[in-house]
Amino acid sequence: MARLAAFDMDGTLLMPDHHLGEKTLSTLARLRERDITLTFATGRHALEMQHILGALSLDAYLITGNGTRVHSLEGELLHRDDLPADVAELVLYQQWDTRASMHIFNDDGWFTGKEIPALLQAFVYSGFRYQIIDVKKMPLGSVTKICFCGDHDDLTRLQIQLYEALGERAHLCFSATDCLEVLPVGCNKGAALTVLTQHLGLSLRDCMAFGDAMNDREMLVSVGSGFIMGNAMPQLRAELPHLPVIGHCRNQAVSHYLTHWLDYPHLPYSPE
């Protein structure tokens, strides 16, 4: 029996309308009744996730910013990882050949250079939103991550530019087909989950995890039981062909799987 369950949010636990379904909330409550530790592992900001947990009265550990921060049940900071100032400066000041919008994150929030109302649709559940700033005046010493949002083909070309400029000084990953992230070296959800399990006195073999994008890859391969969403990025499924694929987030597939796991642990599972 797993002792910890780690969940990506967008494309995994959240439905396409960016809400948590009632079946999902009920299943999370059942896991807690079984003394299974809940962990939300997401690219979203800690401030937003703490608000969501409070609104839902959920007790869960948080891995946020794709592993840049880990918080306890009480909100205590257990781990932090920031971009080096010179890396943040290069990414912010360089003229990149891209149409993608740039977004900067630190402990105070989410910052960008212009209004992009369409991006806020993903945050209707929490009301979290960006702050408009002159990105060239952003303090460089506390940037957790920088991400670019836009067309996937454009982001793929940008990824090549970033690799050429940064080399091994940053970790690049797609958290969605339309979002490319620049993270500290060695920073990912899997590394953050390792920190958390050590804090809790658990083994990664004691954990299960669910995800749908390339920023979930390290987490999914490190745990005892990793599960890929039916709506996952094709790249993730191609890289991890040995992991089981469950249903679509629109059908609350994580809840569907876990209900079977809780009620019929010895029977084979079908996502249908």
UniProtKB/Swiss-Prot annotation:
Binding site for Mg(2+): D8, D10, D212
A biological process from GO: thiamine biosynthetic process
Xref: PANTHER family: HMP-PP PHOSPHATASE, PTHR47267
Keywords annotated in UniProt: Hydrolase, Magnesium, Metal-binding
Ranges annotated as spanning the membrane: none
Active site: D8 (nucleophile)
Primary role: Catalyzes the hydrolysis of 4-amino-2-methyl-5-hydroxymethylpyrimidine pyrophosphate (HMP-PP) to 4-amino-2-methyl-5-hydroxymethylpyrimidine phosphate (HMP-P). Can also hydrolyze other substrates such as MeO-HMP-PP and 4-amino-2-trifluoromethyl 5-hydroxymethylpyrimidine pyrophosphate (CF3-HMP-PP) to give MeO-HMP-P and 4-amino-2-trifluoromethyl-5-hydroxymethylpyrimidine phosphate. This hydrolysis generates resistance to the antibiotics (bacimethrin, CF3-HMP) by reducing the formation of their toxic forms, 2'-methoxythiamin pyrophosphate (MeO-TPP) and CF3-HMP-PP.
InterPro entries from the UniProt entry: Cof (IPR000150), HAD-like_sf (IPR036412), HAD-SF_hydro_IIB (IPR006379), HAD_sf (IPR023214), HMP-PP_phosphatase (IPR023938)
Family recorded in the similarity comment: Belongs to the HAD-like hydrolase superfamily. Cof family.
Organism: Escherichia coli (strain K12)
Protein name: HMP-PP phosphatase
Keyword Magnesium appears in the UniProt entry: yes
Enzyme Commission numbers on file: 3.6.1.-
Co-factor remark: Magnesium. Can also use other divalent metal cations as manganese, cobalt or zinc.
Disulfide bonds: none
